[in-house]
């Protein structure tokens, strides 16, 4: 998982979700697209 100050969807399968006040990008098709907003 990469940590970025600004997160972006990298493909059409990426979803931006919020957990415990942090934003995440999750992608089931390509797990290397996972990101967290730091």
UniProtKB/Swiss-Prot annotation:
Family matches, as InterPro entries: Ribosomal_bL36, Ribosomal_bL36_sp
Example GO molecular function: structural constituent of ribosome
Keyword Cytoplasm (UniProt): no
Cellular component aspect of the GO annotation: cytoplasm; ribonucleoprotein complex; ribosome
Keyword field: Ribonucleoprotein, Ribosomal protein
Keyword match Ribosomal protein: yes
Top-level taxonomic group: Bacteria
GO biological process, one term: translation
Family matches, as PANTHER family: 50S RIBOSOMAL PROTEIN L36, CHLOROPLASTIC (PTHR42888), LARGE RIBOSOMAL SUBUNIT PROTEIN BL36C (PTHR42888:SF1)
Family affiliation: Belongs to the bacterial ribosomal protein bL36 family.
UniProt xrefs under NCBIfam families: rpmJ_bact
Name of the protein in question: Large ribosomal subunit protein bL36
Originating organism: Chlorobium phaeobacteroides (strain DSM 266 / SMG 266 / 2430)
Lineage: Bacteria, Pseudomonadati, Chlorobiota, Chlorobiia, Chlorobiales
């Amino acid at each position: 998982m990469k940590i970025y100050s600004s997160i972006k969807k990298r493909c059409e399968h990426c979803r931006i979700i919020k957990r415990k006040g942090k934003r995440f990008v999750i992608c089931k098709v390509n797990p290397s697209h996972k990101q967290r907003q730091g």
